[in-house]
């Protein structure tokens, strides 16, 4: 499984702290006060001598526990010609380890009424379990065994079986799914050749076919070490006992070598690039992508608010205009998609019969120009912030969501509470001027306009006469296109 995580709050039990502004704070008129208090979730964080970071959060509302292990490695850590390894290794991690037979991990968690899975993005690979709290010790042992002893049981037969499964995933969800290759086309044309964000986490079929068991063993030795991992344990726990178990099962695992992080450059776009992708689809689709920012940027919160104003709900500007008022589109989406180092602001839409991608693009551009000129209304800001807060609180109901967020924030911000405090407060403090500013800064002429059209119908592309036609994005290079 692979996806990119949109950094909204996700978690479980919370405590809300109310703050009255001091006289000095009230005098700081240049800083907008947040409309909602920050969320406080109790946790304890510490680091073992081998570099493993541990985050514990006690919550006795249900007799369950979630365990999340995050490795700070994703598809951006791969190199051109060896793509798909991070996701493939996610599968390999479920093939057994030195003291755990193949299938036993799944059999145990499911047998006690729990569950487990993994996921991969550009930036991380995660593994999790949700189990009754009286099975926590065994779960920690299972995770420690595959962190420390996975290679003891990995052989070519197991590897080839998982490689075939991943190749089938690519066929099912990318190659043979409607619009399944759109973001592969976007990545290849938005970033320079060899850029770590230019390929999707699933990797290319050629690279998957060429991978060997020795390749993935090398990948494990590079990145699967305690000093590149964070473990979050959340729920019905005794913190003192949990610490003893973590020390028992993880403390003796060997620290890995220092991790070499890739040097990440900017997008290759200079001006507008237009691509027509002939695909096995029945209806065309328009996707407009602007280079934006990663999740460390101060502009991430206002861009997130802007995306919701444009396309989240029925009353969002683009959705309301195209789907409901003018009825020229069947669906619309707008989202700010940040990764650790780069980001993309995306708007896509599918036309109704008898309407065209050119019509959609024209109206989308008009709506964006309007918000760049006048900014959002006070009601829009209020509604979007309330919606984001409600969605966040709704997600704060499960141990697993909380564990995922605590692990994420520790791995990428060195603060398990970052999203619950800093990001939450910054988002609630976004002003109309902030939204107007980022709209003008990022939603300009430097963008990629992708028309996904049925095979043989390149005339259905938006402004087809200005667009370069592609049928195989991996072999037909468009890097030399001049905007």
Name each region found by the language model.
Residues 10-21:
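Bacterial N-terminal signal peptides
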Residues 2-5, 21, 25-123, 133-225, ...:
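Mature, solvent-exposed C-terminal subdomains and processed small-chain segments of exported/organellar
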Residues 228:
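Exposed beta-strand and adjacent loop surfaces of beta-rich binding modules
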Residues 126-129:
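Alpha-helical, coiled-coil/dimerization segments enriched in small aliphatic residues
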């Amino acid at each position: 499984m692979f996806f990119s995580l949109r950094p909204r709050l996700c978690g479980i039990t919370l405590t809300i702290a109310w703050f009255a502004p001091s006289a000095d704070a009230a005098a700081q008129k240049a800083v907008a006060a947040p409309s909602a208090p920050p969320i406080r979730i109790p946790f304890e964080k510490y680091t073992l001598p081998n570099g493993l970071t541990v985050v514990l959060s006690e919550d006795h509302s249900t007799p369950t526990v979630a365990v999340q292990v995050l490795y700070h490695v994703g598809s951006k850590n791969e190199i051109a010609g060896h793509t798909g390894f991070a996701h493939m290794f996610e599968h390999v991690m479920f093939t057994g380890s030195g003291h755990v037979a193949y299938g036993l991990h799944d059999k145990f968690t499911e047998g006690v009424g729990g569950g487990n899975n993994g996921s991969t993005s550009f930036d991380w690979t995660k593994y999790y379990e949700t189990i009754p709290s009286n099975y926590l010790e065994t779960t920690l042992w299972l995770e420690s065994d595959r962190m420390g002893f996975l290679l003891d049981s990995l052989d070519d037969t197991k590897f080839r079986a998982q490689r075939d499964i991943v190749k089938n995933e690519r066929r099912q969800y990318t190659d043979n799914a409607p619009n399944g290759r759109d973001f592969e086309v976007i990545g290849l044309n938005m970033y320079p050749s060899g850029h770590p964000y230019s390929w999707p986490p699933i990797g290319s079929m050629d690279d998957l076919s060429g991978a060997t068991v020795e390749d993935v063993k090398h990948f494990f030795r590079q990145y699967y070490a305690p000093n590149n991992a964070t473990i979050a344990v959340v729920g019905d726990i005794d913190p003192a006992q949990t610490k003893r178990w973590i020390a028992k099962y993880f403390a003796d695992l060997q620290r890995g070598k220092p991790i070499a992080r890739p040097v990440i450059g900017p997008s290759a776009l200079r001006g507008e690039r237009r691509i027509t992708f002939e695909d096995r689809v029945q209806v065309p689709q328009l996707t407009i992508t602007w280079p934006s920012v990663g999740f460390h940027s101060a502009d991430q919160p206002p861009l997130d608010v802007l995306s919701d104003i444009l396309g989240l709900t029925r009353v969002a500007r683009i959705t309301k205009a195209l789907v409901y008022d003018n009825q020229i589109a069947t669906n619309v989406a707008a989202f700010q998609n940040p990764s650790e180092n780069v980001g993309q602001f995306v708007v896509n839409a599918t036309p109704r019969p008898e309407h065209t991608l050119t019509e959609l693009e024209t109206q989308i551009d008009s709506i964006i120009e309007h918000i760049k000129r006048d900014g959002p209304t006070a009601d829009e800001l209020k509604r979007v912030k309330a919606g984001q807060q409600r969605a966040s609180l709704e997600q704060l109901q499960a141990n697993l969501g909380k564990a995922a967020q605590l692990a994420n924030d520790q791995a990428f911000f060195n603060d398990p509470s970052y999203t619950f405090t800093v990001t939450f407060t910054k988002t609630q403090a976004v002003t109309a001027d902030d939204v107007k500013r980022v709209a003008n800064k990022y939603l300009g002429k430097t963008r990629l306009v992708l028309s996904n059209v049925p095979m043989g119908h390149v005339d259905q592309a938006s402004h087809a006469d200005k667009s370069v036609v592609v049928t195989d994005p991996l072999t037909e290079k468009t890097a030399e296109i001049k905007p």
